[in-house]
């Protein structure tokens, strides 16, 4: 008799993925394999997006198979603009893990924790390769879930002397600063927050540019994580064109990233090409890593969670 699939709640996923840093080695390998094309053994189409215009939302479907992990997953993610509240968040996600040998469903797990932690871990990988030498000042724009997950791993992996925070709603920025470990300076404007910063993380809901090239220190590194639709932006044309542009997936960036499409900026490399050594990391120049998120990243995290859960049964 076939066993029923396991269901792992957000709390259970969190228990088996306490530190985003655990994801860094397998994610580096997965990024490198993805950027090798078919030879890397990663099968991953660009996400399918189903608009729900009547309710200002969309459903995204993100499947992947990785030969290295011998894992098969798909993530279902919904986003509903302007519907964020305590009862129903704007972003919701579930990850389905299958047995790749026969297609049976092994587990359904909450995808929100996975999304937050794998996204932050990939930003940390990009920063490891692209941040300028002697980086002292970290700036985070946005105070949502991704701000917390990025702060957690960035303070684990790097030694910044100052962390700055800006959010459109100052109350949420102050809540962030008071709830995390360590000192965070809340800034009144984006310009104040980013001036002189070595590493900038944009995790906002902006649909128009909020970060302008004239404010950015030459040689700074920017992780652009928000603006996941082709008509949304966080960065202006000047910044996108003056920086060396890295992406997680060329194909996805040229279909989904408003920052890339609307600026006409040229993509220099995928992050996986930097990890593998196929392309250089220009850490002495201003760099942008445009992160859209990839299904293989969810796969790596889901496999790690499931293996940990299975071993503890």
UniProtKB/Swiss-Prot annotation:
Cite a GO CC annotation: mitochondrion
Q: What is catalysed by this protein?
A: L-pipecolate + NADP(+) = Delta(1)-piperideine-2-carboxylate + NADPH + H(+); L-pipecolate + NAD(+) = Delta(1)-piperideine-2-carboxylate + NADH + H(+); L-proline + NADP(+) = 1-pyrroline-2-carboxylate + NADPH + H(+); L-proline + NAD(+) = 1-pyrroline-2-carboxylate + NADH + H(+)
Q: Where are the transmembrane segments?
A: none
InterPro entries with a match to the protein in the record = NAD(P)-bd_dom_sf (IPR036291), ODC_Mu_crystall (IPR003462), ODC_N (IPR023401)
The residues the record assigns to binding NADPH are 90-91, 118, 143, 145-146, 167-169, 172, 204-205, 225, 291
Write the record's keywords in alphabetical order, separated by commas: Cytoplasm, NAD, NADP, Oxidoreductase
**Annotated compartments:** Cytoplasm
Query: One biological-process term from Gene Ontology?
Result: mitochondrial transport
Kindly indicate whether the keyword RNA-binding belongs to this entry: no
Q: What is its EC number?
A: 1.5.1.25, 1.5.1.1
Q: What is its main location?
A: cytoplasm
A Pfam family name for this chain?
A: OCD_Mu_crystall
Keyword RNA-binding on entry: no
Chain residues that bind 3,3',5-triiodo-L-thyronine: 47, 256
Molecular functions (GO terms): hormone binding; NADP binding; protein homodimerization activity; thiomorpholine-carboxylate dehydrogenase activity; thyroid hormone binding; transcription corepressor activity
Q: Which family does it belong to?
A: Belongs to the ornithine cyclodeaminase/mu-crystallin family.
**Described function:** Catalyzes the NAD(P)H-dependent reduction of imine double bonds of a number of cyclic ketimine substrates, including sulfur-containing cyclic ketimines. Under physiological conditions, it efficiently catalyzes delta(1)-piperideine-2-carboxylate (P2C) and delta(1)-pyrroline-2-carboxylate (Pyr2C) reduction, suggesting a central role in lysine and glutamate metabolism. Additional substrates are delta(2)-thiazoline-2-carboxylate (T2C), 3,4-dehydrothiomorpholine-3-carboxylate (AECK), and (R)-lanthionine ketimine (LK) that is reduced at very low rate compared to other substrates.
User: Quaternary structure per UniProt?
Assistant: Homodimer. Binds the thyroid hormone triiodothyronine (T3); T3 binding inhibits enzymatic activity.
Q: What is this protein called?
A: Ketimine reductase mu-crystallin
Source species: Rattus norvegicus (Rat)
